[in-house]
C-alpha cells in the first residue's frame, strides 16, 4: 500500500458496524455532518482489522435480528475490550447488553414509530438535552435487565430500559434510533457521542479532503497518464477537476456525445471544463452512430443495453488511440461501495472489467470519490471552484434521454423531451425550488391524445412532468410543487414545444413506482 495512505489511519474517525439496519447509511452521514469522518463496515470485522483502522469511536447499528436467533449477527467480542467509546443503537444495545450479562426478551408487541422517552439518569450521552423528548422506535426485543456496571439512562412507557450507560468504560446504548429525523434530539445525541465522548475535533472538511486526495493522486500517479470517461454529470466532472488540479495535462478526458444529452449540455460541459478549467478533453460526436443502432428499438432493456455497449465501443476506440495511459479514473461514490457489499474503500486497485469495459483494457483504477456521499461530492465541487450549473446538475441516467423517450427513439421525440425539460428546469429555478426538489425531469410516454389548439383539432404528444423529494434515492415522494408553478410549466410546454398538446404531473411515490419511467 502506498505510504500516503497513512493519512487515513491518523485521521480521527468513527466506525459504524453494520448489523443490517435500513438506517446504516444515515448513521454514517449524521456523524460526517459534525465534521467527523465515518465509515460503515461489516459486523464480521475482526478486532485486528478494527485496530488497523485506528477508530476514535465505534457505533453498533440496529438490525432485524433477535440476539437469541441462531443466525443472529455477532461482533468480535474483543472489540468491547479495545478501551474506546462504543455506542449501541437498538440491536447494538441489545448485543452489548447480552455480552456484559444483562437480559433481553421478546417484547409483547413490536414497537414501531414515535415514542416519548424520559431521561432519568443523564449520562454524557444526554448532556444538555431535554428530560422528555420524542424518539423513533423500531424493535421487537427489549432490554429487561441492564448489565452489571451499567445504569439505566432513559425509559419509555413501552420500554422500561430505553438507554444504558457505563461511564467508566465509555459504553452506551439506546433502544431508539437517533439517526432518524423523527428523533427530535437525535442529532444532538450523536454529536455528544462524537465530539464530547469520543473527543473528536470535527475538523474533517472538503478543504482538507481535497488537499489530502490531491497529494494521494500525485504520489500514486507520479508522471504517468490518467484516462477519464467524462459524462458531464456531477460525479465524473468533480473527479475530472480534482485529478486535473493534481496532475494537470497528464489527465485526458473522453466525452462521448451520444445525442441523448439534455439541451445545451454538451456545450456547457465543454465550455466549463475545457474553457474555464483548461482540461484536456477529447469530444467524440457519436450521435449518428448511436441513433443508427437504436433505430426501430422500443424495449427499454434493449435500449439500455445498446446504449451501454455502444458507449463502451466508442470509448475503447478512442482509448486505443492514446499511448502511455496507465490509470483509469472513475466517479465511484461511497454509496456504490456500500451497495456492492464491500464497505472497505481502497484508493487504487487493479482494473479489469469495471463498469462493463472490455476485459483487455488493463488499467489501474483510481477512484478519488469512493469515500464520499453525493451531497459531499457537490460540496467538494464547490470547494474546487466549480460553478453551480455543474455542481447542482440534476441526476441523469447513463442512457440519458434514451429512457425518457418511451418506445422507439426518434430525433423529433428527443427534441420534445429536451425542450420541455429545459422549460421545467427554468421554471423550477425561477420559483427558487431547485435545491428543495431532489430530482425533476420530463418524459415522453408513447401515447398521443386529442386536443384543441386555435380553431383546430390536434392529435399530439403528452409530456409527463416528474418531480420527487428524497434523501438518498432509495425511496422518494412526489414533490408538492405549487399549483401556480405547475400551471406556468404546463402553459409554456404546450405553447413553446412543437407537437405537444397535453402535460400531466406524475404523483406516484417510490415504491411502488421508480423515479424514472423506463
From Swiss-Prot:
SUPFAM superfamilies: Adenine nucleotide alpha hydrolases-like, Class I glutamine amidotransferase-like, GMP synthetase C-terminal dimerisation domain
EC number: 6.3.5.2
Signal peptide: none
Start and end residues of each Glutamine amidotransferase type-1 domain: 13-203
Pfam families listed in its UniProt record: GATase, GMP_synt_C, NAD_synthase
PROSITE patterns tied to this protein: GATASE_TYPE_1 (PS51273), GMPS_ATP_PPASE (PS51553)
Gene Ontology terms for molecular function: ATP binding; GMP synthase activity
Name this protein carries in UniProt: GMP synthase [glutamine-hydrolyzing]
Higher taxonomy: Bacteria, Bacillati, Bacillota, Bacilli, Bacillales
Keyword Ligase belongs to the record: yes
Binding partners and assembly: Homodimer.
Annotated pathway: Purine metabolism; GMP biosynthesis; GMP from XMP (L-Gln route): step 1/1
Biological role stated in the UniProt entry: Catalyzes the synthesis of GMP from XMP.
Domain GMPS ATP-PPase: 204-393
Active site (record annotation): 90 (nucleophile), 177, 179
Domain of life: Bacteria
This protein's UniProt keywords: ATP-binding, Glutamine amidotransferase, GMP biosynthesis, Ligase, Nucleotide-binding, Purine biosynthesis
Binding residues for ATP: 231-237
InterPro entries: Class_I_gatase-like, GATASE, GMP_synth_C, GMP_synth_GATase, GMP_synthase, GMPS_ATP_PPase_dom, NAD/GMP_synthase, Rossmann-like_a/b/a_fold
Primary gene name: guaA
Organism the protein comes from: Listeria innocua serovar 6a (strain ATCC BAA-680 / CLIP 11262)
Keyword field contains Signal: no
Reactions this protein catalyses: XMP + L-glutamine + ATP + H2O = GMP + L-glutamate + AMP + diphosphate + 2 H(+)
Assigned GO CC terms: cytosol
